[in-house]
Amino acid sequence: MTEAQTACATTETPVAAPAAPRWRVADVIALYELPFNDLLFRAQQTHREHFDANAIQLSTLLSIKTGGCEEDCGYCSQSAHHDTGLKAEKLMEVDAVLAAARTAKENGATRFCMGAAWRNPKDRHIEPIKEMIRGVKDMGLETCVTLGMLEEHQAKALAEAGLDYYNHNLDTSPEFYGQIISTRTYQDRLDTLERVRDAGINVCCGGIIGMGESRRERAGLIAQLANMNPYPESVPINNLVAIEGTPLENAQALDPFEFVRTIAVARITMPKAMVRLSAGREQLDDAMQALCFLAGANSMFYGDVLLTTGNPRAEADRKLLARLGMWASEASQLSA
């Protein structure tokens, strides 16, 4: 090597090492293990830095295509692999979906989510779903859809329709994932989320707890979410609803305090995200739901049916917020 080559070699810019994760699993476990009052105090402090602590966004979720899904998710009543007595239905007509959205708005919801039980949508499905998105947005509602895995061109088409959020949950930690589903890999989920992000759509991504996972595995889910760059704008936390006919029908109920802890840890690790109380909320009494709000939850799914599981009645939800001195708010009004 010549002197010039040697000089050139020694002055080359070294390749940067990959950035360290913002949250190690051990750090998330340490949050979980804080005394309950200390954890909630820290979560509430974080929450108040970014949001109006007494404002809750009300969301409604409609199943626009029910049952017959090719996936084998162990928790899901809509899987064709499980005998849950759920009849598979075709994609709803656009007018029927828009009628449901109008009802949701009349009942106080400001966010309307549409879910389809597919492994992935066919291209022929995208156009009617774009019509639904446009129609719901014309009502002044925030839009979210969950349709399974997406190809790049499908994500772009949804973005062109003005979709606000795309939901695609990780479900659980990478380590526990194989015990819940075998028909779709963890990387498949991450790839869809990347396509959604690249299309310019806000990411809605969370998981389900109470499926038999350990606290470490719950922490693994939160760390995975919090270390996304950027982390999701919307993080739904689901409490398993054990449905007869699914592999998890006999799952042991999660300690409600562990659910509250998970909400608090999600708030601390993803301070600017909307943390949403999702499926399984009916398993929490009013006092536990109030603790979830204290822990930093600032959205809840609202209405009588959440996909194919029950959800507290809308009137009961309104009364609960009134008793707590809290109020329903537009998404744009939630920030402090």
UniProtKB/Swiss-Prot annotation:
CDD domains found in the cross-reference section: Radical_SAM (cd01335)
Cofactor: [4Fe-4S] cluster; [2Fe-2S] cluster
EC numbers: 2.8.1.6
Catalytic activity, reaction form: (4R,5S)-dethiobiotin + (sulfur carrier)-SH + 2 reduced [2Fe-2S]-[ferredoxin] + 2 S-adenosyl-L-methionine = (sulfur carrier)-H + biotin + 2 5'-deoxyadenosine + 2 L-methionine + 2 oxidized [2Fe-2S]-[ferredoxin]
Keyword set includes Chloroplast: no
Gene Ontology molecular function, alphabetical: 2 iron, 2 sulfur cluster binding; 4 iron, 4 sulfur cluster binding; biotin synthase activity; iron ion binding
One example of a Gene Ontology biological process annotation: biotin biosynthetic process
Residues involved in [4Fe-4S] cluster binding: C69, C73, C76
Metabolic or biological pathway, per its Swiss-Prot or TrEMBL entry: Cofactor biosynthesis; biotin biosynthesis; biotin from 7,8-diaminononanoate: step 2/2
Superkingdom, natural source: Bacteria
Radical SAM core domain boundaries: 54-281
Cofactor note: Binds 1 [4Fe-4S] cluster. The cluster is coordinated with 3 cysteines and an exchangeable S-adenosyl-L-methionine.
Residues noted as binding [2Fe-2S] cluster in the record, renumbered to the chain: C113, C144, C204, R276
Stored Pfam families: BATS (PF06968), Radical_SAM (PF04055)
Keywords tagged on the record: 2Fe-2S, 4Fe-4S, Biotin biosynthesis, Iron, Iron-sulfur, Metal-binding, S-adenosyl-L-methionine, Transferase
Similarity-based family: Belongs to the radical SAM superfamily. Biotin synthase family.
Free-text function comment from the UniProt entry: Catalyzes the conversion of dethiobiotin (DTB) to biotin by the insertion of a sulfur atom into dethiobiotin via a radical-based mechanism.
Quaternary state and interactors: Homodimer.
HAMAP family, per database record: BioB
Name the UniProt record assigns to this protein: Biotin synthase
Source organism of this protein record: Burkholderia pseudomallei (strain K96243)
Annotated gene: bioB
